[in-house]
Amino acid sequence: GFYGIRERARYMRTKRERRSYPLTPSERAYFDSIEIEYSAILRLIHRLRELAEISESDKAPTISSCLARLEVGAPTTLYERLMLIYLYFMLSESVDSYQVRSLGSGLDHDLAEPFANDLSSGRFNENQLDDFIGYFLMQFSAIGNYWGQPLYLGGTNLDGSCRMNDMTLRILDIYDNLGIYNPKIQIKYSPNTPDKYLEKPLDMIRRGHSSFVFVCDDNIIDSFRARGVSFERAHDYDVKGCYEFALRAGEFSTAPIYINLLAPILRALDDCSDGDSFETL
């Protein structure tokens, strides 16, 4: 959670200072930025919790309890995990102006365990949990990014088995019933993916619910291995954006510009009438 990231950064700063104090200016700026950023996030969560505590809404106690947990640690329930993802998205997109091009690291994998725990503990019933997932998906349909908000499902476990589970089908069923096309869903599949996990999205596509991209795990993992990356490191790569892929916590890619390869030709044919020289092109 946000709290854990800040505490880990504090620990690493202390460890670094003990080894080679004083910190360099760049190191100090790095640790200071984490402290400032995550302390601000935790203050925001605290303020939201205080508002929930004085709200008369029937939903307020659940919201307050969720935010109280995120103030001090990692999420433990399905609702808390969804809230963490949503807060991260809103802070990145609306405060940092930084696009969030996925939701979680395989949403079905991220939600399967807390869903089962919530059911077995009696904390929430199945309908409530389905509603949480549905409302979560509807947030991004309402935001309506014209390029779509990606999330991915599926993948491959470390032992080579299919990572899909009952939560995969549950998310697809909820998405299907809502009849939305945003978020757009990426399906990580491989030759050993059981048919039921592919038949569901294919059936949806035939009925016009077609906001899907299929990503072949084997080919992508092989492309990593061809560059010297081990299977153990590559098997849980992330999918983001349209259908780009990246080693989890191992890449930082950017797309800051569009290159118009036709422009120099057009300018040359136009005889550079605006006064530009070849060198300035």
Q: Predicted regions span which residues?
A:
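Conserved catalytic cores of very large enzyme subunits
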Residues: G1-E37, I54-L281
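Secondary-structure-rich domain cores
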Residues: I45-A52
